From Swiss-Prot:
Family: Belongs to the PurH family.
Reactions listed under catalytic activity: (6R)-10-formyltetrahydrofolate + 5-amino-1-(5-phospho-beta-D-ribosyl)imidazole-4-carboxamide = 5-formamido-1-(5-phospho-D-ribosyl)imidazole-4-carboxamide + (6S)-5,6,7,8-tetrahydrofolate; IMP + H2O = 5-formamido-1-(5-phospho-D-ribosyl)imidazole-4-carboxamide
Enzyme Commission number(s): 2.1.2.3, 3.5.4.10
Record-annotated MGS-like domain positions: 1-115
Domain notes: The IMP cyclohydrolase activity resides in the N-terminal region.
Gene that produces this protein: purH
Listed Gene3D superfamilies: 3.40.140.20, Methylglyoxal synthase-like domain (3.40.50.1380)
InterPro entries: AICAR_Tfase_dup_dom_sf (IPR024051), Cytidine_deaminase-like (IPR016193), MGS-like_dom (IPR011607), MGS-like_dom_sf (IPR036914), PurH-like (IPR002695)
Annotated protein name in UniProt: Bifunctional purine biosynthesis protein PurH
Length: 452
């Protein structure tokens, strides 16, 4: 006869599968509360209090922490074949349940641990060494994540633990490299034209971060972790059209993120090949239109934004958020309300560009983006070359201070009328004086916005 020890928080959730086990002849043992629940639903269950001699202590805080219980899990001839525990969710802290799971995982050759529906079904249905090792490994990973979450309730950021997810990635950054996902991604794939890749996820997250932080309704197109076009406005179709056409060549095969619901009209207007489309919501009609294409549709959820890299074998994390504070006029004529919106728009998009970056915008559209340059002067030059005649009367944003006045000279020569950039260079006064000399309005940004 097979025997299982269970202790459940969400008792209703597992009622059917435990009834099925009972009907198949399994002997069910349970903590007092779970045993009473099962019996009330017509499932025979043995109460572990018949082993320990008490139902619970301290008002239910101690139920299964007893030498006889753990001897029945850890011994050479264990009392149970499977130990299944559904732990208390945050912010509660489960002590006995975690201990039961760890004990079962330690004695994996004799006892199979399970902590959710998936692992429970595996423990019940398959009995071979590979499955036992898998269940033990998954259990230790699960309890590690559980403890990590509780640690952060006391000291923020003290611990991180992620379980490898089943989400399959097409490949890594390059086709010859493998890739894995650790931690459940905060997005829902509504349609997957082909398997999502490592690069798709990174590009989509950057595109969404910029799109959701635009000053009003807008769209951003990302390619290779940098924006190649963005637009804001009032008409959804026009916004998307302008964002794509801002760099028509580079947007091919890019990632589009919008901060409004993707509807049928916008979906039908999309003629350019895109790898991923990210939106806070999609109408069913839009999904039907876009599902005919080899495009992934992502609906993001809520999550804290972090930027991270593996370096020297360590995971290095940084918060990602826009700086608080307003632009401060340093020199020149104040901009109109519309021009100031363009300036804010440019600053919020340049945040997502690879540093060094300079971005030129006009009438709610990016017209030139110079990014990923070791030299800020070169970034400014690339932005003006891309903008061409559209730079005249436009505004520009720099993701960090101007170390020399030369970048301003390049922007002024192209016709840019105003810039926003943080200060902090030893040549700030020289740069400000050059802006005054060139007739460029200079606004101070609250902080630099590097992106590596």
């Amino acid at each position: 006869m097979k025997r299982i020890l269970v202790s459940l928080y969400e008792k209703e959730k597992y009622l059917d599968i435990l009834r099925e086990l009972h009907e198949k002849g399994w002997e069910i043992w349970a903590s007092s509360g779970t045993a009473k629940f099962l019996k009330s639903n017509g499932i025979e269950a043995n109460d572990v209090s018949t082993i320990t001699g008490f139902e619970n202590l301290l008002g239910g805080l101690v139920k299964t922490l007893h030498p006889e219980i753990f001897a029945g899990i850890l011994g050479p001839e264990p009392r149970w074949d499977v130990v299944f525990v559904d732990l208390y969710p945050p912010p509660d802290i489960d002590i006995g349940g975690v201990a039961l799971l760890r004990a079962a995982a330690k004695n994996w050759k004799k006892v199979k641990p399970a902590f959710d529906m998936e692992t429970l079904k595996l423990a019940i249905e398959i009995d071979d060494e590979e499955t036992r090792k898998y269940l033990a490994g998954m259990t230790f990973a699960f309890t590690s994540v559980y403890d990590s979450i509780r640690a952060n309730q006391f000291v923020e950021g003290i611990s991180l633990a992620f379980k490898r997810e089943d989400l399959q990635l097409r490949y890594g950054e390059n086709p010859h490299e493998k890739a894995f996902v650790y931690g459940k991604p905060a997005f829902e794939i509504l349609h997957e034209g082909k398997t999502i890749s490592f690069n798709n996820i990174l590009d989509a997250e950057n595109a969404w971060f910029m799109a959701k932080n635009l000053p009003r309704m807008g769209a951003v197109v990302v390619k290779h972790q940098s924006p190649c076009g963005a637009a804001i406005g009032e008409d959804k179709v026009e916004i998307v059209k302008k964002a794509i056409e801002a760099d028509d060549e580079s947007s091919f095969g890019g990632i589009l993120a919008v901060n409004f619901e993707m509807d049928e009209e916008v979906a039908k207007s999309l003629k350019k090949y895109l790898e991923v489309i990210v939106a806070p919501s999609f109408t069913q009609e839009a999904i039907e239109v876009l599902s005919k294409k080899k495009v992934r549709l992502l609906k993001p959820g809520d999550y804290a934004s972090w930027a991270g890299k593996m370096a020297f074998g360590s995971l290095v994390l940084s918060e990602r958020k826009y700086p608080e504070g307003n632009f401060e006029l340093v020199v020149g004529e104040p901009l109109s309300e519309k021009e100031l919106e363009d300036l804010e728009f440019a600053y919020r998009v340049v945040e997502g560009a690879k540093s060094n970056a300079v971005l030129i915008a006009k009438d709610g559209v990016t017209v030139g983006i110079g990014s990923g340059q070791p030299s800020r002067k070169r970034a400014a030059w690339i932005a003006t070359v891309m903008a061409g005649e559209k730079a005249k009367g436009a505004v520009a944003a720099s993701d960090a201070f101007f170390p020399f006045p030369d970048s301003l000279e390049i922007l002024a020569q192209a016709g840019v009328k105003a810039v926003v950039a943080p200060l902090g260079s030893i040549r700030d006064e020289e740069v400000i004086e050059k802006a005054r000399e060139l007739g460029i309005t200079f606004y101070k940004a609250p902080s630099r916005v590097f992106r590596h």
